[in-house]
């Protein structure tokens, strides 16, 4: 009887694992495609607004069908919480993340997102939810070591771009030119800074979402409500770059396709799958799967979009992922203690 229960428990974990893996592979392709769309010159927050609006349209009927009988009463406090959730996890995060992506690459963007567990750990120390005393244990020391390796990898890919690695089909316009190398370096550093700010906002969103999901456990309607607020927030943030209404009229078929794909897969399905994954597998396990997006983005960038990669990005990404898994190893030992 006990053995049967263990088999059922193991088998019940496979669906969320498979969904998370597929989700992260898709996220890697989303980042690579959005980067290509940004290179066309579209306002990054207009892409963000359309992407999130599509997400809310997709999720609204799903939420109504699956959750209409269990949705809790929506109070003013819950509305404010979803407004903040939209700000941290969607609009403000995308403002910095997409701006950073436009200056760097999908590989760098996914690598810096791998810093998320380490940043969350640092916030936990600052907010005293992680006890300082626990740092003296073996698990605590491993977590600190993993955090340091993570940050070192991120710093390496930020400050060392290195020579490009291209294949025979790499686009020549994407390759660096000596006459504007200083400008490229400045943009690269700015891009990494913006991506780091975006990752910090995602970390804060995850901490905030942990509390919100207890008060409002309906994942589809919660994500939909968050997306509605975030779409309006993105529209306001788009004024930072342009106030011309014509910029909202997109006639490039590739960009339209990317926005739809990013809205359905990268925003709606990805947010729901991560929320479900955290609930079923735990935040640590979900964090361990997230580097798959980095591998997916790199392969999609290099093989399909023929974008050159940089040595610094590859070495820094390996360092960041190594640090992530060292950190997760320490976290696992901490949970077992």
From Swiss-Prot:
Cell compartments where the protein resides: Membrane
Membrane topology: Multi-pass membrane protein
Main location: membrane
Location of the EamA domain: 27-157, 220-328
Pfam families: EamA
UniProt GO MF annotations: transmembrane transporter activity
Source organism, top-level taxon: Eukaryota
Membrane-spanning residues: 14-34, 46-66, 83-103, 107-127, 139-159, 188-208, 220-240, 254-274, 284-304, 309-329
Keywords for this protein: Membrane, Repeat, Transmembrane, Transmembrane helix
Annotated SUPFAM superfamilies: Multidrug resistance efflux transporter EmrE
Any single GO CC term annotated in Swiss-Prot or TrEMBL for this entry: membrane
Annotated family: Belongs to the drug/metabolite transporter (DMT) superfamily. Plant drug/metabolite exporter (P-DME) (TC 2.A.7.4) family.
Name recorded for this polypeptide: WAT1-related protein At1g11460
């Amino acid at each position: 009887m006990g053995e049967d229960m263990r088999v059922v428990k193991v088998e019940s974990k496979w669906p969320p694992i498979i969904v998370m893996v597929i989700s992260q592979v898709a996220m890697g392709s989303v980042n690579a495609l959005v980067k290509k769309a940004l290179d066309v010159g579209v306002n990054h927050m207009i892409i963000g607004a359309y992407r999130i609006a599509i997400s809310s349209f997709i999720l609204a009927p799903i939420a109504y069908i699956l959750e209409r009988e269990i949705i809790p009463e929506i109070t003013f406090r819950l509305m404010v919480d979803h407004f903040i959730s939209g700000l941290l996890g969607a609009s403000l995060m995308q403002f910095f993340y997409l701006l950073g992506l436009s200056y760097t690459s999908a590989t760098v963007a996914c690598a810096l997102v791998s810093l998320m567990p380490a940043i969350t750990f640092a916030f936990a120390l600052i907010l005293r939810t992680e006890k300082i005393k626990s740092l003296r244990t073996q698990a605590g020391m491993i977590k600190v070591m993993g955090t340091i390796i993570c940050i070192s990898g991120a710093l390496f890919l930020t400050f060392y771009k290195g020579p490009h690695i291209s294949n025979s089909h790499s686009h020549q316009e994407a390759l660096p030119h000596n006459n504007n190398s200083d400008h490229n370096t400045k943009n690269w550093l700015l891009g990494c800074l913006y991506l780091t700010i975006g990752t910090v906002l995602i970390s804060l969103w995850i901490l905030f979402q942990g509390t919100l999901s207890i008060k409002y456990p309906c994942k589809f309607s919660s994500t939909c409500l968050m997306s509605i607020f975030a779409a309006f927030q993105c529209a306001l943030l788009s004024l930072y770059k342009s106030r011309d209404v014509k910029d909202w009229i997109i006639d490039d078929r590739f960009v339209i396709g990317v926005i739809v794909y990013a809205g359905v897969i990268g925003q709606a399905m990805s947010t729901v799958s991560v929320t479900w994954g955290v609930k079923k597998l735990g935040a640590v396990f979900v964090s361990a799967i997230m580097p798959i997006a980095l591998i997916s983005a790199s392969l999609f960038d290099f093989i399909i979009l023929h974008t050159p990669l940089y040595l610094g990005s590859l070495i820094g990404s390996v360092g960041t992922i190594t640090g992530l898994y060292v950190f997760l190893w320490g976290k696992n030992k901490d949970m077992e203690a």
